[in-house]
Amino acid sequence: MLPRRVDRRQFVISGFTLAGSTILAGAAGCSADEITSIPASTGSSLEHSALADSDLAEPPVIQSIGGRLSAGITCGTTPVWVGGRRAREPVTYNGLFPAPTLWVRPGDTIDLTFSNKIVFDQAETKPGYGRPPRTSHTTNLHFHGMHVSPGGTADNMLVMVSANGHQRYLFQVPANHPAGLFWYHAHVHGLVTNHVGRGAAGMIYVANSYTDQVTRLGIRHRLMMLQQAYFEDDRSRLISDDGERDDPDLALSLINGQLMPDIRMQPGETQVWSLLNGSTSAFYVLRLEGHAFTVVAIDGVPLISPRVDQETLMLSSGQRMEVIVSANSNKGRYTLSYDAYDQGVDTWPHKAVANVLIGGKAWVGGSHPGVDTSSPVSDLSTASVPDELHRTIALSQDDAVPEGEFGRFTINGHAWDPAVSEWTSTLGTVEEWLITNDTNQDHPFHVHVNPFQVIKVNGSPVAFSGHQDVAIVPRFGSITVRTRFTDFTGGPVLMHCHILDHEDMGMMTRFEIA
């Protein structure tokens, strides 16, 4: 018998122990028996595999109570189901693919006890790789896009958790933090692709009164992590795409760990989709047959006005979008797919990734309120920026270094060195960065802690729409961004290419804030 379907809004668990960690949240109309029926599409346990490739399910939610989210997160390598296959040697959190979603509100405290239980069956090194072997057991956590401290027990990338080690991540979400989709994932340099590519990632959603309003209107809110999965030739061992088997044509394109799930809508229904490109390197050009999207937020930050009638959505690795989808009145099956995209070196093929099934009675619900205006962002293009706060960040490729080896990719002429800081920025200032790309491929550029505003692409001004933490720097081109340092001193604050193998090969650097 198939386990009972559990809607994300219902799946908030009270005192339920999941893979060695206690999930503390308020139960929402579920008995204990109902709660333990975890949809298999999350990769939770082998006996639930029958639900793979069926209706889209979402990872279980760990929700804050009384202003605090307290939970255990265990990173391990126990086999899980991925896209309907039993996968050996994943790297998952709490045995789930994707990991549990952390659901918090501005002002909440996040208190995670993180345990490293990574065990690989086979020794595996790559000669000349110049970075840790893929079987290294060291790991940590990065809270991608979250505007929290880069030091201490928060988003500190110098923290390393060794095998069988533990780390407490304890920090507060600022009271003025924007509502939207963020994520957490492994971030040890040299191992990022290997761990994230095998599943070490989960979503974070920051909710506020705007989120509550959408819920009261009866509008369904779906969270979707878009991923690629690669398997060895025997189709059982999950591997990453860091040179082991990195042909985009061989990847399984997954949503919430499922292969070609069904997304159900009623005729005329409005839904909100929060989308995360949680892949290590893929560029997704998302298209829904017969429908258009309305974009209301990018990288967890609301736009100043919605982008309507968008036939496609472009998401590079690490990017998020929140979109409104309105089903048309014609019942039937519509394909959600990726258009082909030429990144310069890799070409990501056209692929169907889900079926949207429109059926049943016509939907009766409220109108979506549009963009969230509770946390407005400032247009930095009009700010006065002195010459000394204009900086250049050069993304380059050293062709003398073989493909796959450390030093292949660089920023400002050098590969990642944790002891080298580019500069120290001053709290309260606005800086302008020219980010150049002299390589033959597009690079998604990501900055930790502080979002930025793109003001130019290839020297041409860009109209103000909002702030983001990932932006594509076009091949042989540039972007110009501005960023304001409003909180948090210290560091390190990292910036890097979010093609994670490029980061692992050196395209990352750091700065501090004082």
Annotate each language-model stretch with its function.
Residues 14, 26, 31-72, 76, ...:
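Extended terminal and domain-junction accessory segments
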Residues 2-24, 30-168, 240-273, 303-305, ...:
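N-terminal, post-signal-peptide metal-ligating segments of extracellular/periplasmic oxidoreductases
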Residues 164, 172-213:
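Long, hydrophobic, well-ordered secondary-structure blocks that form the structural core
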Residues 141-146, 177, 182-191, 433, ...:
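Histidine-centered catalytic micro-motifs
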Residues 150-155, 160-162, 230-375, 462:
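Histidine- and aromatic-rich segments of cupredoxin/plastocyanin-like copper-binding domains
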